[in-house]
């Protein structure tokens, strides 16, 4: 058999087993662990003089109805919390991922994976020098402006989870869409937005009927927030309804400790599955020791991106954020004290360390309500890099690569939010049968600016050049909506997630919804142990005077970095 050098192979088909890829300008390196394409020398590749031609890599007679792929991503490097770091062809058909492996024509090629047959129905994305990830899920979104969708897609986020009705004071502070009428209007509004949505109802009610009517109107879960009273009684009532109707509950706890301390809130959870927002506390929650929640096996902890990674300016910007988001007045001393109680440098630094240890399982944005919706993937990779520089290699990493660390942070913005919300069987990873929400990145821009964003197997968002140019690449290049963002294709490639109660009561027909409507499921059995690569249960102590955080008896701290990767090199502002 003819042999070529590793360099020549990489030039032709991209990296393979043992090759390493640097992620942007960071110090993170991933190494390909497995090549799922079976054998070398029979690669499928699109282009002039390449192999994806009729009678070669393209099967002559197979129809789409009989199983021919709609789209193949060839020779791509997959970075996925479930799959690991692997080389593969990825096949898509009818908006779903068919599988990973070797694609092509089994009549002329050896080792073609079952189901990954290419033919006249198949289009191609050349993935040889690209990285493929699952579309990200932002689990903490205030629906303040519909233009958030554009910013989210521009950083590889394909699913939003939160609540609100626009730029009203309640939505500026709380991620809930309150009551049946507001839920109906929001479900109607998002019909034209090319991204998946889950809407949280207002969980702040000790009465049961107002909670149930929200689920039947299309809420996909609940949020309990301190601005509406996160009392133990409210939490218990909301969790009881959630248990009966199989939906998730997110909670923003009581910063002022008026109705109890963190131990009282944990007791109110009563061992039931609950998602704690911004578990560090700068975004809100029991001061100063909310971090104790990350050591509970029934609690699914997340935190938000404004403090990730903790840089030299992180603390300084938080005060004004809190004052604006929670309708506080800087002329009122008690309002100022409320804001100041949430800003603790020691716990903010510990937040990054706990993420690196896998103790905090998810990252959300807290969009326009302290966080930045277009930076969730970005902040995850920046934090991974900052922690490598501050703490060194993780014990789980193999010598010479950062695979485990990178996959840990990828899980925080993909599969773990999906599992928590009850949609992990549909999105969150690159697995057979899942919705083809996928993101392609050039390695130099990984985590910062995607090349293509696919929704339901069709390109929805892309970095596109001048439409009047002779090529797709001439300037000005910026993100533009693509065909999956237009017409009725939008409704076929984007999902609205609702409760099973709403789904069974025909919410789509009642409200005239044209998007794909799917019910959440399995939320009440999810615990910390299910958080992929992020299931660590430490013992947390917070000094009430200095706010120093000890994790299993060891002070959890690092020096804030003076500079951060994937930052000014990539942005004009």
UniProtKB/Swiss-Prot annotation:
The Gene Ontology CC terms held by the record are: cytoplasm
Predominant location category: cytoplasm
Q: Which cofactor does it need?
A: Ni cation
Residues holding substrate: 225
Q: Which residues carry this modification: N6-carboxylysine?
A: 223
Superkingdom as given in the UniProt entry: Bacteria
From the UniProt record, which GO molecular function terms apply? nickel cation binding; urease activity
Active-site residues?
A: 326 (proton donor)
Q: Might you give the EC number(s) for this enzyme?
A: 3.5.1.5
Q: Which PROSITE patterns match?
A: UREASE_1 (PS01120), UREASE_2 (PS00145), UREASE_3 (PS51368)
The family database entries (CDD domains) matched by this protein are listed as: Urease_alpha
Quaternary structure, per UniProt, is:
Heterotrimer of UreA (gamma), UreB (beta) and UreC (alpha) subunits. Three heterotrimers associate to form the active enzyme.
- This chain's protein is named Urease subunit alpha 2
């Amino acid at each position: 058999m003819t042999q070529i050098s590793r360099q020549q192979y990489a030039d032709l088909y991209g990296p393979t087993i043992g090759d390493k890829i640097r992620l942007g300008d960071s110090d993170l390196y991933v190494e390909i662990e497995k090549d799922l394409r079976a054998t070398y020398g029979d690669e499928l590749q699109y282009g002039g003089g390449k192999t994806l031609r009729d009678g070669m890599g393209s099967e002559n007679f197979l129809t789409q109805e009989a199983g021919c792929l709609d789209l193949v991503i060839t020779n791509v490097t997959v970075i996925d919390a479930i799959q690991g770091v692997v080389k593969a062809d990825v096949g898509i058909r009818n908006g779903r991922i068919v599988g990973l492996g070797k694609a092509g024509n089994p009549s002329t090629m050896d080792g073609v994976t079952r189901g990954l047959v290419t033919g006249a129905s198949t289009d191609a994305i050349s993935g040889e020098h690209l990285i493929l990830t699952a579309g990200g899920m932002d689990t903490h979104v205030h629906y303040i402006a519909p233009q958030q969708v554009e910013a989210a897609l521009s950083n590889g986020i394909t699913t939003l989870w939160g609540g609100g009705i626009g730029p009203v004071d309640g939505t500026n502070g709380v991620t809930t869409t309150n009551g049946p009428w507001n839920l109906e209007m929001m479900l109607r509004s998002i019909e034209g937005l090319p991204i998946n949505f889950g809407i949280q109802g207002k969980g702040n009610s000790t009465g049961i009927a107002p909670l149930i009517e929200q689920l039947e109107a299309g809420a996909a879960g609940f949020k309990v927030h301190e601005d509406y009273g996160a009392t133990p009684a409210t939490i218990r009532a909301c969790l009881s309804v959630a248990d009966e109707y199989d939906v998730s509950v997110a909670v923003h706890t009581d910063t002022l400790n008026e109705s109890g301390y963190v131990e009282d809130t944990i007791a109110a959870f009563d061992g039931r599955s609950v998602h704690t927002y911004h578990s560090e506390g700068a975004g809100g929650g029991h001061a100063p020791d909310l971090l104790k929640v990350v050591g509970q096996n029934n609690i699914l902890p997340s935190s938000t991106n404004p403090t990730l990674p903790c840089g030299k300016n992180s603390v300084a910007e938080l005060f004004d954020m809190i004052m604006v988001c929670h309708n506080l007045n800087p002329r009122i001393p008690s309002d100022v004290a409320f804001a100041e109680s949430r800003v603790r440098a020691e716990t903010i630094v510990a937040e990054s360390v706990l993420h690196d240890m896998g103790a905090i399982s998810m990252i959300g944005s807290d969009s326009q309500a302290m966080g930045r919706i277009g930076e969730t993937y970005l902040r995850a990779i920046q934090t991974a890099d900052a922690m490598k520089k501050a703490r060194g290699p993780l014990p789980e990493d193999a010598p010479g690569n950062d695979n485990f660390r990178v996959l840990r942070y990828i899980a925080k913005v993909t599969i773990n939010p999906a599992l928590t919300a009850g949609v992990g069987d549909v999105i969150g990873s690159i697995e057979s049968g899942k919705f083809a929400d996928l993101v392609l990145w050039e390695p130099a821009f990984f985590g910062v600016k995607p090349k293509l964003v696919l929704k339901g197997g069709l390109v929805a968002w892309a970095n596109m050049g001048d439409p009047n140019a002779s090529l797709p690449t001439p300037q000005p290049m910026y993100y533009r909506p693509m065909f999956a963002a237009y017409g009725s294709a939008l409704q076929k490639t984007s999902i609205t997630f609702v409760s099973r109660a709403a789904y069974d009561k025909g919410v789509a027909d009642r409200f005239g919804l044209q998007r794909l409507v799917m019910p959440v499921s399995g939320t009440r059995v999810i615990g910390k142990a299910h958080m992929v690569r992020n299931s660590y249960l430490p013992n947390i102590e917070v000094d009430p005077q200095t706010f120093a955080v000890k994790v299993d008896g060891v002070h959890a701290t690092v020096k804030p970095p003076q500079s951060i990767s994937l930052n000014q090199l990539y942005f004009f502002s």
